[in-house]
């Protein structure tokens, strides 16, 4: 699962009778886990940027169309298990699935996401957001190694490589925030559609695993139709500071890969984000978020269930800049502060998101 910065649509009501930054700034609240990417069954299933992501892009309550372009960078190059780092020897000699007599030693997964978001707000209460991702991913692994571990199993000639490039799974999310006169409280209902290639669409192109299918959760799509439920709340806490909170739950309600021996269902994911923004200036808005994610294990014969669940926490500083009257630029860096991962998973040391938002 991956949550985009433009997914959670917080609308700050704009009172044109007021003066100062708060009456003129179209704001961007980057909230969620940045990018919780659909990562590998044998890499990190609970990694993100952003992005949000996991994340929220919000505009003042004016109606109209808005375009959002976003780039997310996630380099998973650290092997972790439980709450600490892991080693190749640990993966093989203390495998997450003892029945295998060893484990897969992954090297790295580099993810680059290019996301297009188009939203329409017919009035102050409703917003509809379409999100289309393009995924560029490379993955390298030393493959499955049997006990006991020996250093020759992690020499460069043992590496296999795979590359994924194409459209990912599209999301359509509706937001309603007419519950309060202030429009500070909102609810979300959405769906993720299986538009990306899934299952065994892409195989390793080099190394000893060449020709073998890439892990199902490393493909561009999951093959599942997911239900998305969310809620968010925004509150000014002083003349210059705002606080916000959001929660989102995503679960697969159907999956194409449902045949014996060829089935895959991504695990459910729950995100929670808390943050503050400093709106002293109308030209630039610094912000800080705490992003939490819990993900259950993937299911099915194509899933690596022991290595796909966990809980992670990120601290995410960000900045939004008003470049033109209708154009805003934003950036977020996500720093992991805690992780408790099942099995062994590849994990990023940091992630980054940059984007622009334009009122059409």
Each language-model region and where it sits:
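Outer membrane beta-barrel transmembrane domains
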Residues: 80-82, 86-96, 250-360
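Repeated loop/turn-to-beta-strand initiation elements of outer-membrane beta-barrel proteins
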Residues: 65, 126-128, 182-185, 240-243, ...
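Residues that define the transmembrane beta-barrel architecture of outer-membrane proteins
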Residues: 63, 110-114, 156, 164-170, ...
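Outer-membrane beta-barrel biogenesis signature
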Residues: 39-93, 182, 194-199
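Residues on the lipid-exposed face of transmembrane beta-strands in outer-membrane beta-barrel proteins
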Residues: 55-57, 69-71, 116-120, 130, ...
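Transmembrane beta-barrel strands of outer-membrane/channel proteins
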Residues: 67-73, 130-134, 187-193, 245-249, ...
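Outer-membrane pore/translocation modules
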Residues: 134-263
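Extracellular loop and loop/strand-boundary signature of outer-membrane beta-barrel proteins
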Residues: 54-55, 100-104, 154-161, 214-219, ...
């Amino acid at each position: 699962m991956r949550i985009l910065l433009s997914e959670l649509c917080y609308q700050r009501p704009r009172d044109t009778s007021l003066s100062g930054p708060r009456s003129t700034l179209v704001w961007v609240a980057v909230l969620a886990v940045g990018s919780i990417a659909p990562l590998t069954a044998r890499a990190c299933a609970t990694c993100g940027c952003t992005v949000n992501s996991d994340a929220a892009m919000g505009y003042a309550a004016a109606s109209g169309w808005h375009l959002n372009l976003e780039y997310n960078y996630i380099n998973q190059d650290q092997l972790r298990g439980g709450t600490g780092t892991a080693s190749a020897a640990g993966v093989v000699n203390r495998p997450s699935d003892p029945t295998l007599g060893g484990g897969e030693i992954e090297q790295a997964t580099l993810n680059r996401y290019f996301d297009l978001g188009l939203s329409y707000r017919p009035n102050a209460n409703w917003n509809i957001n379409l999100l289309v991702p393009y995924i560029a991913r490379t993955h390298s692994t030393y493959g499955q190694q049997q006990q006991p571990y020996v250093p020759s199993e992690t020499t460069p000639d043992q590496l296999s490589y795979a590359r994924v490039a194409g459209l990912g799974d599209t999301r359509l999310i509706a937001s309603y925030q007419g519950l309060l006169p202030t429009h500070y409280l909102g609810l979300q209902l959405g769906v993720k559609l299986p538009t990306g290639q899934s299952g065994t669409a892409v195989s390793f192109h080099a190394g000893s695993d060449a020709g073998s299918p890439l892990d199902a959760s490393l493909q561009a799509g999951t093959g599942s139709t997911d239900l998305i439920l969310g809620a968010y709340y925004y509150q000014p806490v002083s003349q210059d500071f705002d606080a916000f909170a959001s929660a989102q739950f995503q679960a697969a309600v159907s999956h194409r890969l449902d045949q014996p021996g060829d089935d895959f269902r991504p695990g459910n994911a729950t995100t929670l984000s808390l943050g503050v923004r400093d709106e002293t200036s109308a030209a630039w808005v610094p912000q800080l978020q705490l992003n939490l994610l819990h993900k259950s294990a993937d299911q099915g014969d194509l899933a690596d269930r022991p290595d796909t669940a966990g809980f992670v926490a990120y601290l995410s500083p960000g900045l939004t800049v008003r470049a033109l009257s209708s154009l805003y630029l934003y950036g977020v860096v996500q720093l992991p502060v805690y992780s408790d991962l099942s099995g062994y998973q590849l994990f990023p040391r940091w992630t980054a998101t940059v984007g622009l938002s334009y009122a059409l």
